[in-house]
Amino acid sequence: MKERRGKTAAVKQALEHINATLGTDLVLMTDADALFESDTIANLLKWFSDPSIGCVGATPKRIGQRVEEEGHRSMFSMVRNLESKMDSTPFLEGSCMVWRAEAMDSSALHVTSNADDAQIATNVRIHGLRVIQDSSVYFIDHAPHERKEHSRQKVRRAQGLQRHLLRQKKHWFNRRHGRFAPILRQEAALHILTPLMLVGALIAMLARWASIGFAEIDFTNATLTTLHVGLFTAEMVLLASWFTVRYGLRIPLLNQVGTVIDGNLQLIRALWKSARGSSLHMWDQHQDGRN
């Protein structure tokens, strides 16, 4: 590649070369810093004895991950496994995934967007074969230690998935895809609608506090007082839960809630960058946690 155009463009060029010269049945994609267990590849390849399987991905084991990354990755993998059992998952980890070459149309890759792994996984399923994540097969990679690098990585990945899901909207209600269509709708709701709802909730919270500060609220009204106290308590619990993951405090239950909030904040940032026309499909790899 003569000039830097982003990872997806590089993946597309590599796939075109493979299809033109090698004629292989299966394609394995990984990252330069990903480590495999001794039986990772062999266990992934076993799945292809089933002709309905088009793509299989391994489950990540992260080294040095922050509290929010640990919580996010646990929930992310759980959802991938559930989707795999229902039908197929639209998202896999590009650090270790294998697919049938004939099931993937490389021309469908959008080179000005990232999430190349999700693009490949979804394309294979749309062509009729199942896409699954194997919960018992692992790869190992490094997660950023610093909050700044963690957030930068999450926002970039979030934007890629959001843009990918929006491009798939014609498949959200396509009955030909069976149970995969509801999965796409669910992921679109989680990655696009939910963060927008959080923005609405934040605006409503600020408006409520403004009304308390500038309007004459009758706190002798027991019902109104109970409502405000209840909302204040809920807001403080949610804020405290976010602080636990923001500053690496391990507190059960609060960490899980904080992980969800933190993830949606990254999704909001990704939506904002997209709204401003900022594309994150080209980036500098984080060095934090790799040395």
What are these regions (language model features)?
Residues 2-3, 24, 32-34, 116:
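Short acidic donor-binding/metal-coordinating loop in glycosyltransferase active sites
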Residues 34, 90, 97, 118, ...:
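Residues that recognize and position ribonucleotide moieties
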Residues 210-213, 244-248:
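Juxtamembrane "helix-exit" motif on the non-cytosolic side of transmembrane helices
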Residues 223-247:
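A C-terminal functional module that forms or caps the active site or interfaces directly
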